[in-house]
């Protein structure tokens, strides 16, 4: 049975996520940076607890293990690995004097390549990064600076796996003292290996992790009532810098919009109805795109319904497998004329 809204839901969610990336100027690299839920407060907070634990449990980190254990008898790949195929490396930012700017975008550049760590040996990864640095900054002082930062970043990862396991889980709960100690160790390591670059690389991340840890402590405090917990959580959030608060509000609005859109689709609201209801959350341009995707999906559903009816007629002929496949493929090509439509129909036929 085909789920009517599965494709458009997926596309809308992707569109919203990509929109957030463009607006915020952030390159999300999920193998490198574990995401922490920033949604509405759940007083039990089980998922946030798990995510924070993943961030500080460095002994099992894919990035650190990968960089430290693979052989080095490899050369730079002649083509981009599959994980980077079809993409372009982010630009390395410069300041007004031509030096490498001390901003988080430099880490975004390196993390872009680290998404390919499972496809390359450390030596090949190093060659790939060096090649792109030269390509972007050849002959400048920023080239030397970028190479030095990359070396420091790799040193950070190589030392990260050597940090002791602090036993951050007691039974089925987090040991908040151990988690705090682990965060302190990572912050200290970042300063030792990256120096002045530790702040642009990890400052915001460390602030978020410590904030999430404080939320967990409040949520876990059995001496507090639910009302007291909510008040303390609000007070804690108000201590965040205004820019961080604004970003959290924006992310929450986008999450709310995704939930609302999915519900509107389940309720079979028209595309224009969806646009009117989400324009306040997303703005007119994105709301229009969402409505247009919904409209195109309705057109697709009608096409597929027509195609499925004709395919049933082919099935009823009990043809030889080869002849059956030829006729079905011809039917697809005749009905689905836009790029990717025939492939989508074939996937639904499985």
From Swiss-Prot:
InterPro entries: Lipase_chaperone. Keywords: Cell inner membrane, Cell membrane, Chaperone, Lipid degradation, Lipid metabolism, Membrane, Transmembrane, Transmembrane helix. The keyword Acetylation does not apply. The chain crosses the membrane at residues 12-32. It is found in: Cell inner membrane. GO terms for cellular component: plasma membrane. It holds the Pfam family Lipase_chap. Signal peptide: none annotated. One of its GO terms (molecular function) is unfolded protein binding. May be involved in the folding of the extracellular lipase during its passage through the periplasm. HAMAP family: Lipase_chap. NCBIfam families: PRK01294.1-6. Belongs to the lipase chaperone family. This is Lipase chaperone. It comes from Xylella fastidiosa (strain 9a5c).
């Amino acid at each position: 049975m085909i789920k009517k809204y599965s494709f458009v839901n997926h596309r809308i969610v992707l569109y919203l996520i990509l929109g957030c990336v463009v607006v915020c100027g952030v390159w999300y690299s999920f193998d490198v940076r574990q995401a922490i839920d920033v949604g509405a407060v759940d007083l039990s907070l089980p998922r946030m607890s798990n995510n924070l634990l993943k961030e500080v449990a460095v002994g099992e980190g894919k990035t650190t293990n990968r960089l430290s254990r693979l052989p080095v008898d490899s050369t730079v790949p002649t083509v981009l690995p599959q994980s980077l195929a079809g993409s372009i490396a982010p630009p390395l930012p410069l300041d007004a004097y031509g030096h490498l700017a001390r901003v988080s975008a430099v880490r975004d550049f390196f993390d872009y390549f680290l998404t390919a760590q499972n496809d390359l040996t450390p030596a090949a990864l190093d060659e790939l990064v060096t090649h792109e640095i030269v390509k972007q900054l050849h002959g400048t002082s920023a080239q030397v600076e970028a190479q030095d930062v990359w070396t420091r970043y790799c040193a950070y990862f190589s030392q990260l796996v050597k940090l002791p396991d602090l036993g951050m889980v007691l039974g089925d709960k987090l040991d908040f003292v151990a988690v705090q100690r682990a965060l302190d160790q990572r912050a200290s390591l970042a300063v030792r290996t990256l120096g002045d670059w530790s702040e642009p690389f990890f400052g915001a991340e460390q602030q978020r992790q410590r904030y999430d840890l404080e939320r967990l402590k409040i949520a876990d405090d059995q001496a507090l009532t639910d009302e007291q917990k909510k008040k303390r959580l609000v007070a804690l959030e108000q201590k965040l810098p205004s820019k961080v608060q604004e970003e959290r509000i924006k992310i929450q609005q986008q999450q709310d919009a995704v939930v609302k859109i999915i519900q509107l689709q389940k309720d079979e609201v028209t595309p224009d109805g969806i646009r009117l209801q989400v324009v306040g959350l997303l703005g007119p341009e994105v709301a229009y795109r969402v409505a247009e995707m919904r409209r195109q999906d309705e057109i697709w559903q009608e096409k597929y319904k027509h195609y499925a009816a004709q395919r049933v007629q082919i099935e009823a002929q009990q043809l030889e497998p080869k002849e059956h496949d030829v006729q079905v493929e011809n039917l697809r090509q005749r009905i689905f004329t836009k790029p990717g439509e025939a492939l989508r129909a074939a996937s639904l036929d499985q």
